[in-house]
Curated annotation (Swiss-Prot):
GO terms for molecular function: bicarbonate transmembrane transporter activity; chloride transmembrane transporter activity; chloride:bicarbonate antiporter activity; oxalate transmembrane transporter activity; protein homodimerization activity; secondary active sulfate transmembrane transporter activity; spectrin binding; sulfate transmembrane transporter activity. Residues 1-75, 127-137, 197-206, 283-291, 368-370, 407-410, 465, 505-744 are cytoplasmic. This is Prestin. One of its GO terms (biological process) is regulation of cell shape. It comes from Homo sapiens (Human). A motif (Involved in motor function) lies at residues 158-168.
Length: 744
């Protein structure tokens, strides 16, 4: 069989033939029978809600304590090795990040270790993701540090501070108190949102928004770390233009940089960059990524202790790491009114980052995460953790990739990582007291590489979507210069405005028919597509509501070229001209009405006398005109039907319904029918609820599809032509005749 025969057979088998009636809405409803649905009464719903069965109790436990579902099904032989390797790899990364992110949060380093321990244990019981790593995250830590520095600035005067050391300790204690308060409030917000099933709020933080926000946060983190890398003493700034002030402060003090601190930092920086490139290039051959950050911490601590860098070269180090866990403490709730804006921003950003990474890894491994339960889990981790003096946590992107990439199967890997942190807190913390802050600064800056790579989004969005590019840029700029809290608020407002813009300014298309098919496509896109004579098909790809209803009406007239007002005016002008030509001045005042009015024959133009004044009845303008009048007709005057394609309209509000009713009436006044094609059940309900079908005859305007509407229009016109061409009956010729009396 040659290719020509194959193509013939393929073409024959790819055709379909359907024979059915033209489905207007009434005809289709006659063929359908609605299923009887008996709605549950309120009493039945309450009874069902408060009914207690073993299965229901089990499902509730599974929902709020996911560990009770996956732990009994734990496949020990398959999972234990992967969880063990993953836990160790994540733990050695979590140690330096916990210390470094505490610097971002403007609290002593030990509190970064607390935040790497308590929340991880709680998330193991409460979280639905098996792979993400919970704990300190650079962006959230920076936001915590921003509010802590705003309320407790570097130059604050602490009453009772005898010397600089005591003053610094008192200042740090106040910042810890602020961090605990904002962490508690953000946790309460997350928990309440989860209980109220508001997990969907993450959808308002679109990917361009999140990526623009995290890129701006990366710039904030980078500028915050420069002072530690250069070893200079500068004031820490927060709020509007803080990134500018921080950069200027570092540059002004660059002449005072600590060469030893910079040298150690650059050495670690180069080691980490080269090592990460090695890990990436040979990741298929390595059983696990080399824990570069841990080696950097060990090496930096060893060099600092061996050469006594703190005393000999005045290098800033981590300092005291007290052993043991602190007893629970009550956060200061009196600060809530000062930090609620920051708490809301931290709660939303923390959840958005967490659910984004959780869904990515869940899709990769074939399971689902519950956004509402993730909110509850984060809320409890933060609110309960604040009692143990932790600061707000989230999902760490870099640690999550390590935990998943090294073979982690469940959150037992996270538990093992937290136990390693506990070992440092209880026994070995003093070993890291000589660690230079420049090493931690280099670790943080290197881990920002992935966020800085998001600048490559700009050419991508430039090619694909200017609106998403606008969201990215406005989010980045506002978050960079207004601060992360107000920047996020601005970004969300901009994102919502783009939604309004998209629906207010949708694309409008005039459709034509692909010959010998029932397919209707944009006539401006393809040469083969042709308009059907006398019919205009108009499509919108958005809902019709108060923000775009007038624009829709205007676009309909502009795109189709059929404007009822223009047609009416042209007809009046033509009639006046025609009246003058036939010498009948009174006809110039005649009224033009729709074509299907019930006026026929000579009586249609026969004058009547009333109170001595001669009046003419309305003149009927049909689809054909004398040649003398046709010269004055506008281009759209030969159109008899406008079909509105509603297949892409998902709702229409009361303002849209009024606009639609006005369109139907306006076109009807000049003898043009308006059909609605492809209305969804929701749109039909909206039209019914807003009394669009108050006149039952309007149901005849609804058609199941564009093709049904086209065929219905053509059938109507054919019947009208047949009726017009039929010879008049005897009764029409002799309207006053009386029927003959039959003979007896």
């Amino acid at each position: 069989m040659d290719h020509a025969e194959e193509n013939e057979i393929l073409a024959a088998t790819q055709r379909y033939y359907v024979e059915r009636p033209i489905f207007s809405h009434p005809v289709l409803q006659e063929r359908l029978h609605t299923k009887d649905k008996v709605p549950d009464s309120i009493a039945d719903k309450l009874k069902q809600a408060f009914t207690c069965t073993p299965k229901k109790i089990r499902n509730i436990i599974y929902m709020f304590l996911p560990i009770t579902k996956w732990l009994p099904a734990y496949k020990f032989k398959e999972y234990v090795l992967g969880d063990l390797v993953s836990g160790i790899s994540t733990g050695v990364l979590q140690l330096p990040q916990g210390l470094a992110f505490a610097m971002l949060a403007a609290v002593p380093p030990i509190f970064g270790l607390y935040s790497s321990f308590y929340p991880v244990i709680m998330y193991c019981f409460l979280g639905t993701s098996r792979h993400i790593s919970i704990g300190p995250f650079a962006v959230i830590s920076l936001m915590i540090g921003g509010v802590a520095v705003r309320l407790v600035p570097d130059d604050i005067v602490i009453p009772g501070g005898v010397n600089a050391t005591n003053g610094t300790e008192a200042r740090d204690a106040l910042r810890v108190k602020v961090a605990m308060s904002v962490t508690l409030l953000s946790g309460i917000i997350q928990f309440c949102l989860g209980v109220c099933r508001f997990g969907f709020v993450a959808i308002y933080l679109t990917e361009p928004l999140v990526r623009g926000f995290t890129t701006a946060a990366a710039v904030h983190v980078f500028t915050s770390m420069l002072k530690y890398l250069f070893g200079v003493k500068t004031k820490r700034y927060s709020g509007i233009f803080s990134v500018v002030y921080s950069t200027v402060a570092v540059l002004q003090n660059v002449k005072n940089l600590n060469v030893c601190s910079l040298g150690v930092g650059l050495m670690v920086f180069g080691l980490l960059l080269g090592g990460k490139e090695f890990n990436e290039r040979f990741k298929e051959k390595l059983p696990a990524p080399i824990p570069l950050e841990f080696f950097a911490v060990v090496m930096g601590t060893g060099i600092s202790a061996g050469f006594n860098l703190k005393e000999s070269y005045n290098v800033d180090v981590v300092g005291t790491l007290p052993l043991g866990l602190l007893p629970p403490a009550n956060p200061d709730t009196s600060l809530f009114h000062l930090v609620y804006v920051d708490a809301i921003a931290i709660a939303i950003v923390g959840f958005s980052v967490t659910i984004s990474m959780a869904k990515t890894l869940a899709n990769k491994h074939g399971y689902q995460v519950d956004g509402n339960q993730e909110l509850i889990a984060l809320g409890l981790c933060n609110s309960i953790g604040s009692l143990f003096q932790t600061f707000s946590i989230s999902c760490s992107l870099s640690r999550s990739l390590v935990q998943e990439g090294t073979g982690g199967k469940t959150q037992l890997a996270g538990c093992l990582a937290s136990l390693m942190i506990l070992l440092v807190i209880l026994a070995t913390g003093f070993l890291f007291e000589s660690l230079p802050q420049a090493v931690l600064s280099a670790i943080v800056i290197v881990n920002l590489k992935g966020m800085f790579m998001q600048f490559s989004d700009l050419p991508f969005f430039w090619r694909t979507s200017k609106i998403e590019l606008t969201i990215w840029l406005t989010t980045f700029v506002s978050s960079l210069f207004l601060g992360l809290d107000y920047g996020l608020i601005t970004a969300v407002i901009i994102a919502l405005l783009t939604v309004i813009y998209r629906t207010q300014s949708p694309s409008y298309k005039v459709l034509g028919k692909l010959p010998e098919t029932d397919v209707y496509i944009d006539i401006d896109a393809y040469e083969e597509v042709k308009e059907i004579p006398g019919i205009k098909i108009f499509q919108i790809n958005a809902p019709i509501y108060y923000a775009n209803s007038d624009l829709y009406s205007n676009a309909l007239k502009r795109k189709t070229g059929v404007n009822p007002a223009v047609i009416m005016g042209a007809r009046r002008k033509a009639m006046r001209k025609y009246a003058k030509e036939v010498g009948n001045a009174n006809m110039a005042n005649a009224t033009v009405v729709k074509a299907d009015a019930e006026v026929d024959g000579e009586d249609a133009t026969k004058p009547e006398e009333e109170d001595g004044e001669v009046k003419y009845p309305p003149i009927v303008i049909k689809s054909t005109f004398p040649e003398e009048m046709q010269r004055f007709m506008p281009p759209g005057d030969n159109v008899h039907t406008v079909i509105l394609d509603f297949t892409q309209v998902n709702f229409i509000d009361s303002v849209g319904v009024k606009t639609l009713a006005g369109i139907v009436k306006e076109y009807g006044d000049v003898g043009i029918y308006v059909y609605l094609a492809g209305c969804s059940a929701q749109v039909v309900n909206d039209l019914t609820r807003n009394r669009f079908f108050e006149n039952p005859a309007l149901w005849e305007l609804l058609f199941h599809s564009i093709h049904d509407a086209v065929l219905g229009s053509q059938l109507r016109e054919a019947l009208a032509e047949q009726e017009a061409s039929a010879p008049p009956s005897q009764e029409d010729l002799e309207p006053n005749a009386t029927p003959a009396t039959p003979e007896a």
